[in-house]
A protein has these predicted regions:
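Gram-negative/organellar outer-membrane beta-barrel architecture
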Residues: 284-285, 304-538, 622-623, 629, ...
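C-terminal motif of bacterial Sec signal peptides marking the signal peptidase cleavage site
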Residues: 15-18
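C-terminal outer-membrane beta-barrel translocator/porin domains of Gram-negative envelope proteins
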Residues: 276-280, 360-364, 476-659, 669-701
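One-face residue pattern on beta-strands with alternating periodicity enriched for small/polar residues
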Residues: 370-376, 412-416, 442, 516-522, ...
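Sec-dependent signal peptide recognition
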Residues: 3-10
Length: 770
């Protein structure tokens, strides 16, 4: 570490000099450093949520000061470092554009901010609030100080709704007990806006298609004294006749093969009348019964927003249309209370072909590429089905380490057929959810050739269902999941050598039938960008051999088999919880907890290789090569023929601080911790202690003492449609070392070539690690 002290100090000095915030200021210019709000400074009275109100007020001031990361104004530093470019192009000009010009105190408009902050306080119920502003200058830096005198916060004394003088006001009063305006609550303008929206939503459900929240007024009387207000809800006199009467649906016209070019021709067609639908399509693109599942409206019923939104969502999510447009038109120019519903659907192309090439560089020193071709056929049986046929092949070679020059080949072929409905034997479900449920069948073959070690063949077939409960929750259930896994070896000597050094591999890599079911659940609110805290959760349960084990007999060895292949029996559960906390717009603290547990029983002594848990790698504990960490305190030998180490139990924790550097470049600082374990210690074969994996068994009291810990930094290029990342990590805790020696901070030596070769792990990946 001492060898790096001088270079680091020099680099730090250059950084401080470049980031000097006042370096480029001209004489008389003052750098604006931000705003501070003081609430009732001359009074001992405290207001509710003072800290939150203070933060909200400071956030509303303009302009914003120059951005900073951990207190350092990097963008201003880039601007200062660039200076005045002498050429219209070039590096200095580019650097200046990526930076930020200094925000000056002269840019602050005190009166404007006074008015904005006062208005905000009034909207929060401080009807007598007043804000005044001033500036403070120290050397070349200045800030704005705003003093807010709030007065008392007003409460609601009484709420009055319009009298029942007509159908509209009667319908408003029907749900007045659901009002958001509660006697005793504080005055809050956002609540009043939401109350208007609530009334509008209620009316939209009973036919008031043309009504709008703008036709409601909420009058506030603050003259009654004692810091109280009376609230009166009224319908504006200017509300048009169309807005104050309910409408029913007369005709439902569907154009399933619509285009602007064919618009006039389609309207001249004689429609196919099916149930309540008039279908205009002389090409019979879709079967009419498809629209029973997509369109929730019926002739003669009152318009309601729920059916409107559910119909729209289903048509968008069915995966058959590139454009969906829904139009409600008044019949006979508003002379009656009826609407015609016109649905214009533009189908996606029947067939499409996608081709992709990806490069890989893994933390176990394998580099290579993969080619994938996917053929998609839509609307296969004219019911919006989708058939996906894909073929992919990949090649990897190890560039360094004890397995230098080892190659890995992979080939995958998969067919997947998706039906936009639930297909359940002996039952016809009727789903009214906005998100259309799907039945998915798939069949795949995968071959993985690990050079001179082994070749893994896997055939898998599944039948199951996918359905979204709402925009946050998604379920996948495969009641039938059948896999056949077979392993071949170059010769018997290779096989015997593998099993001799690791007897547990015999049960792991033997030919197996996996017949079972699986279910997984996903919850996420990541689509809500306005949230400060976003959460993602994934939970999975998988079983194998449970039911089939009851119907298969045992062979001479006491094994239950299907076609003379052992039936695998196990239970496997996994949970993945992630939290993303936005400290600022460009600074996010991401955390993950990953847990896994597998239990083999009955016919099986260990989990199948494809169902085991692994640790290490670019999306795991990044300071350790992929699949080489654990189990427990065991360390695989450097000369091991088979380095992959699987386990029955997994615990992993990741914490990552993500920040924007400039433009599309983002940085990250991270810490990873985790390990895998076997449920029981692997003692090897009797009389062969060299085959044992000592320390591999799970003991609850030793869990945290046996965690591996790594840390590092990353650079990410985020261009919206994909993210390319480079992470470099190194271990700070090695669980396979003797107790008391596992923390290795004192061994860190970036100046040592040997230390870097043995400890630095580079990970290149597509997308974020979690």
């Amino acid at each position: 570490m001492k060898k790096l002290t001088r270079p680091l100090l020099f680099l730090l000095a250059c950084l401080v000099w470049a980031c000097s915030s006042t370096k480029s200021l001209k004489p008389g210019q003052i750098l604006y450093t931000g705003a501070e709000v003081k609430i009732n400074p001359d009074s001992s009275g405290k207001i509710d949520n003072e800290k939150q109100i203070k933060n909200d007020l400071e956030a509303k001031t303009r302009p914003r000061p120059n951005s900073s990361i951990l207190g350092i104004k990097f963008k201003l530093g880039l601007y200062n470092l660039a200076g005045e470019p002498k050429k219209p192009k070039g590096f200095r000009n580019w650097l200046r554009k990526k930076g930020e010009a200094p925000v000056l105190l002269n840019d602050v408009k005190l009166k404007y901010n006074n008015d904005v902050l006062t208005s905000y306080l009034i909207s929060e119920g401080y009807l007598q609030a007043n804000v005044t502003g001033d500036t403070i200058v120290k050397e070349k830096k200045g800030k704005a100080i705003y003093t807010a005198v709030t007065g008392q916060r007003y409460k609601i004394n009484k709420v009055t709704f319009p009298p029942d003088t007509g159908i509209l006001t009667k319908n408003i009063n029907v749900n007045k007990d659901k009002t958001l305006l509660k006697v005793g609550d504080f005055y809050d303008i956002d609540t009043y806006k939401n109350e208007r929206i609530r009334i509008d939503n209620d009316l939209k459900e009973i036919g008031y298609f043309y009504f709008s929240p703008d036709y409601l007024i909420i009058q506030v009387d603050s003259t009654i004294g004692k810091n109280l207000v009376n609230i009166k809800v009224k319908v504006k006199d200017i509300a048009p006749d169309a807005a104050i009467k309910p409408y029913t649906v007369k005709n439902i016209n569907i154009y399933p093969n619509y285009s602007l070019r064919r618009d006039s021709a389609l309207r001249k067609l004689n429609p196919l009348v099916y149930n309540d639908f008039n279908i205009y399509d002389n090409r019979n693109t879709f079967k009419p019964k498809l629209f029973d599942r997509l369109v929730f409206f019926q002739k003669g019923e009152a318009y309601n927003r729920k059916d409107h939104n559910q119909s729209l969502n289903r048509m968008v999510n069915v995966g058959a249309f590139q454009d969906v447009r829904v139009e409600f038109l008044p019949v006979d120019s508003f002379r009656n209370n009826q609407l015609d519903l016109n649905i214009y659907l533009t189908p996606l192309k029947k067939n499409s072909l996608t081709f992709s090439v990806t490069g890989t560089s893994k933390s176990n020193n394998f580099v290579g590429s993969e080619v994938k071709v996917t053929q998609t056929t839509r609307n296969l049986f004219r019911n919006a089905e989708q058939l996906d046929l894909s073929v992919s092949g990949g090649f990897e070679t190890q560039t360094k380490g004890t397995s230098l020059g080892k190659n890995s080949l992979s080939f995958t072929a998969e067919g997947k057929l998706t039906f936009p409905r639930l297909i359940v034997p002996f039952y016809k479900p009727n789903s009214t959810n906005a998100f259309i449920p799907k039945t998915i069948t798939s069949l795949s073959y995968q071959m993985l050739n690990r050079g001179s070690e082994y070749t893994l063949h896997a055939i898998k077939g599944e039948y199951g269902y996918n359905f979204k409960e709402n925009q946050y929750k998604e379920h996948n259930f495969n009641p039938i999941s059948i896999s056949y896994v077979a392993t071949s070896f170059p010769d018997t000597n290779t096989r015997d050598s593998l099993f001799k050094n690791n007897p547990l591999l015999r049960s792991t890599l033997e030919n197996q039938f996996i017949v079972g079911s699986n279910y997984n659940f996903t919850y996420t609110n990541q689509m809500e960008d306005s949230r400060r805290n976003n959460v993602y959760f994934y939970g999975a349960l998988e079983t194998g051999g449970n039911v089939w084990g009851l119907f298969t007999s045992k062979n001479n060895e006491g094994k239950r088999t299907i076609f003379n292949v052992p039936l695998t029996q196990f239970i496997r559960v996994e949970a993945d919880l992630r939290d993303y906390y936005k400290i600022t717009k460009n600074l996010i603290w991401a955390n993950r907890l990953n847990l896994g547990y597998g239990y083999a029983y009955g016919n099986s002594s260990s989990l199948p290789f494809v169902k085991q848990f692994f640790a290490g790698g670019s999306n795991d504990v990044r300071a350790f090569p992929a699949r080489t960490l654990g189990p427990g305190t065991y360390k695989v030998r450097d000369d091991a023929i088979f380095a992959d180490q699987g386990g029955d139990i997994k615990l992993m924790l990741n914490s990552e601080l993500r920040f924007k550097i400039v433009s599309i470049f983002y940085g990250a600082l991270f810490v990873d911790a985790g390990n895998i374990w076997l449920r029981k210690e692997d003692l090897g074969e009797p009389g062969k202690p060299e085959t044992a994996r000592l320390g591999s068994g799970f003991r609850l009291k030793n869990t945290f003492n046996e965690l591996a810990v790594g840390t590092g930094a990353g650079l990410r290029v985020d261009v919206s449609i994909f993210v390319v990342r480079l992470d470099v990590a190194f271990p700070v805790r090695k669980p396979y070392l003797p107790e008391g020696q596992r923390w290795v901070f004192n061994d860190i030596n970036f100046g040592s070539k040997d230390w870097r070769r043995q400890n630095l792990i580079f990970n290149i990946g597509i997308g974020y690690p979690f």
